Every structure is written in C-alpha cells, then in structure tokens.
UniProtKB/Swiss-Prot annotation:
It comes from Desulfitobacterium hafniense (strain DSM 10664 / DCB-2). The keyword DNA damage does not apply. The lineage of its organism: Bacteria, Bacillati, Bacillota, Clostridia, Eubacteriales. Belongs to the RimP family. One of its GO terms (biological process) is translation. Keywords: Cytoplasm, Ribosome biogenesis. This is Ribosome maturation factor RimP.
Amino acid sequence: MGESIMEQVEAIIAPVITEQGLELVDVEYVKEGAHWYLRIYIDKEGGVDIDDCTNVSHLVSEVLDKHDPIAQAYMLEVSSPGLERPLKKDEDFERFTGKLVRVLTKEVYQGYKEFTGYLVGLIEDDIVLEYEKERMAIPRAIVDKANLTFEF
C-alpha cells in the first residue's frame, strides 16, 4: 500500500509552508458530523498571525487542488497550534526543554496513562520529564500524544 493521505498531504504542503518562513507543526484530517476537515497547524518564532494563516490557506489550497490527494470534499482550516502545541518531532523536544508538558500513553505505563512534568528532553528513545525532583522516562513507542501545557 502507498502513502497515507496525511503523508501525501504533508509532502505536498510542507515545502510551500517552509518557503514562507513557517513551520508545519501538524496536520489533521477528521470527520465532524457530516463534514470532513483538513486542519493545518503552522508556527514561527514569535507566533503566527491571521495574515500568515490566510496566506498559507491560499497557497496550500492551490497546491492541494493541483495534486488532489483527497477525493472527497473537505473544509480547509489553517491556524496556530495554540498554547497546547503538540510535540511530535525530535526538534520539538529540544526546542521546548524546560517547558511544562503533558504526555498521554497508548497503554498503562508504571500505573498511569497520563504524565505531566517539565521536559528534560528526548534521551535515546524516551521522553524524559521531571516533576517534584523525580525523573520519569516514558518510551516514545507507547506515547499517544505529547503537548505543551500550562499552569494556572
């Protein structure tokens, strides 16, 4: 079997986004009610604004129409990843070292499926967090989601 739709979409749109001096953070293709949504999350140092999102929306729409990787109709949304930005790439784990992070696992690990702590980094293939002077290494292979979080 070939590439998934998301892999195709990412391969098509990543160069367009990078050319604008932006980072492709994440892509989601989800059905909500009767409608499909293609959500593209972009970022840059200092954050993105509405003009960045509008510009990327137009550019991405053109390139997706040309390559047409998605058969059915969908709504395109381009936005910032927000305060709870997902951490997916190795670079994310380096860039956000010291930040408060929430990690959800696919299975119970050491009695839990949810972990919150300050990101120490990606060490070998473990996401290492520190909370109340205790370190926890969570195997990346069992991680479902990792994202920045914030304290109230």
